[in-house]
Swiss-Prot record:
Residues 1-379 form the FMN hydroxy acid dehydrogenase domain. The lineage of its organism: Bacteria, Pseudomonadati, Pseudomonadota, Gammaproteobacteria, Lysobacterales. FMN binds at residues 106, 127, 155, 251, 306-330. One of its GO terms (molecular function) is L-lactate dehydrogenase activity. GO terms for cellular component: plasma membrane. Belongs to the FMN-dependent alpha-hydroxy acid dehydrogenase family. InterPro entries: Aldolase_TIM, Alpha-hydoxy_acid_DH_FMN, FMN-dep_DH, FMN_HAD, FMN_hydac_DH_AS, LldD. This is L-lactate dehydrogenase.
Amino acid sequence: MIISASTDYRAAAQRRLPPFLFHYIDGGAYAEHTLKRNVSDLSDIALRQRVLRNMSDLSLETELFGETLAMPVALAPVGLTGMYARRGEVQAARAADSRGIPFTLSTVSVCPIEEVAPAIQRPMWFQLYVLRDRGFMRNALERAQAAGVTTLVFTVDMPVPGARYRDAHSGMSGPNASLRRIGQAITHPHWAWDVGLFGRPHDLGNISTYRGNPTGLEDYIGWLGSNFDPSISWKDLEWIREFWKGPMVIKGILDPDDARDAVKFGADGIVVSNHGGRQLDGVLSTARALPAIADAVQGDLKILADSGIRTGLDVVRMLALGADTVLLGRAFVYALAAQGEAGVANLLDLIAKEMRVAMTLTGARRIADIGRDSLVNLP
């Protein structure tokens, strides 16, 4: 299959992956309306073309939390990334490192912190949930600090797991799920050989290290359901703010009032996000929510955004709507599943190329030049 655009990787991933894994990353909550709108609302935003602007010294570089990024992009935390390629978190982290951007390790990664951090040169970020087991949370924070993690991404939009009906149909969950997954693996020999056989152990590395026993795919959904904490409030985050000395980013903000609360709390940044449409169907797309949030808190903290970003044009659109940096989730997992580390590196090259074209034709020589006046009409 020829890969010529950043969006080509989705089809390549679907061909390679067993259905339970493809639909787990590809799907969303309920009827998936928000999932679809994340993409469509962003693609509907019109950029303002400018010409004869002397764009010969264009640069994608930006600064974030004291780090220099080659472009305003980071890889988002994605659970079970290590099931999409052999030791997938390590491969994705290496690709991000080679392209000068941060990689964010998920709490529910296959590869543990101690395996991923030594594989790269630049410090990685780490994502954490609020869980009933506060001992695990403290243990994870201590291990992250010991591994040299600089930035903590704290996900707050998952006090309960979303209703992801596609998972039950695909075999990730539901009746006879284990047998269905085995059958799917048999019919996808490339994945079965690369990941199923040589990508072991298939457990949740960060959790298994803490518990002292394997926590595999069979335990994943049950562990999530029993450990997410619906009683969470801003007060529950205070000890984490005191404990964590580096930048702390609150992920899962969709409302300006919550963004203002994050400022009061002392967060260094927020991620405007609806969890990729995987939590509550029917909420605003990130593209629709971002402008009002930027108006409310821009300048008080750093604004990151995810959900619906598939191309370099999408990155530029999000920056114009008010983001300082974006997170790529599904897009990099598709590339990882299709071509491993090389696929993620190539995806980032394609996105950088698409950004350069968009910036050249909108008259933005620097990332700071991208703003509301880069758009024809706001949504």
